[in-house]
Amino acid sequence: MRGLVRLGLTGGIGSGKSTVAGLLAELGAAVVDADAIARHLTAPNGPAIASIAATFGPDFITSTGAMDREKMRALAYADITARQRLEAIIHPLVRQETQRQTLLAANQGHPCIVFDVPLLVESTTWREKLDWVLVVDCTPATQISRVMARNALTRDEVEKIIASQASRRHRLNAADAVIFNDSLSLGALALEVDEVARHFGLSCQPLSPNQK
């Protein structure tokens, strides 16, 4: 396959999607990480902070000038209209930065761009922009145990997050390829990623030291 390849990458929380993105980056892909962009937007004095404060009030901004993630998470999962108001602030800014990073990666000559998007399947606009969709999958039990250990959330909190995302079946139905990452070692996962890259004909090559 010649030319720039646009690969959508998604998976439920705790699936290992970000690890897969990192492995693809090591092969030379440019990664556009929607979560990382959103975190930047809501970091201290980030581009979204003023609108969040105006919409939700100063109680949702920490003393450092960042969005209070814990408080906002609780509100968003309890009140769908609040979540929609937050998304109306965040999503246009994420799209703008995504477009900037995509253009930059293309101009730099990357063979493929990986769009790491947690809510890719839920979106009505992403699929038409992509050549392929790769889903990183694992069982719900594995999701829960990983996220509880990583984020210090309760089981109930993790289950609410999982319930707010696309169903496992929905994600799998949208996939052009699937990596089942339930109990893979990092080495085994890397081999799976290499196989997927070959399957799609991605011309990714490991980065040389001066490119990293």
Swiss-Prot record:
Segments traversing the membrane: none
Gene Ontology molecular functions: ATP binding; dephospho-CoA kinase activity
Annotated DPCK domain residues: 6-211
Cross-referenced Pfam families: CoaE (PF01121)
Pathway connected to this protein: Cofactor biosynthesis; coenzyme A biosynthesis; CoA from (R)-pantothenate: step 5/5
Broad EC category: transferase
GO biological process annotation, one example: coenzyme A biosynthetic process
EC code(s) of this entry: 2.7.1.24
GO cellular component term, pick one: cytoplasm
Keyword annotations of the record: ATP-binding, Coenzyme A biosynthesis, Cytoplasm, Kinase, Nucleotide-binding, Transferase
Residues the record lists as binding ATP: G14, S15, G16, K17, S18, T19
Localisation per UniProt entry: Cytoplasm
Catalytic activity: 3'-dephospho-CoA + ATP = ADP + CoA + H(+)
InterPro entries (UniProt xref): Depp_CoAkinase (IPR001977), P-loop_NTPase (IPR027417)
Entry's family note: Belongs to the CoaE family.
NCBIfam families: dephospho-CoA kinase (TIGR00152)
Function: Catalyzes the phosphorylation of the 3'-hydroxyl group of dephosphocoenzyme A to form coenzyme A.
Protein's recorded name: Dephospho-CoA kinase
Lineage: Bacteria, Pseudomonadati, Pseudomonadota, Betaproteobacteria, Burkholderiales
